[in-house]
Amino acid sequence: MAIGAYFRPPSMTAAQYDDVIQRLAKAGAGAPKGRLYHCCFGTGDGMQVFDIFDSQENFDAFGEVLMPILASVSLDPGQPMIEPIHSIIVG
């Protein structure tokens, strides 16, 4: 079952987000297995992230790569809200 993961870190700038994205790409996780959609939004130090993964298992596997990267740049992701997806409407 697909899941949505919403991250609202206590503080994250666009520059910090961009740095994490570059580090994920270098680690071979720029396009992780099972991720269907990814978006980042917000302003200032209030950047937020929403992902949709095809399964909890693939999301958890991505987390095994993501969390050490976040720790290496001292970024606290906060506690994500993770819920099953009821529907996705495109367009």
Enumerate the language-model features and the residues they cover:
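Short S/T/G/P-rich N-terminal loop/turn motif that feeds into the first structured element of a domain
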Residues: 1-50, 54-68, 75-91
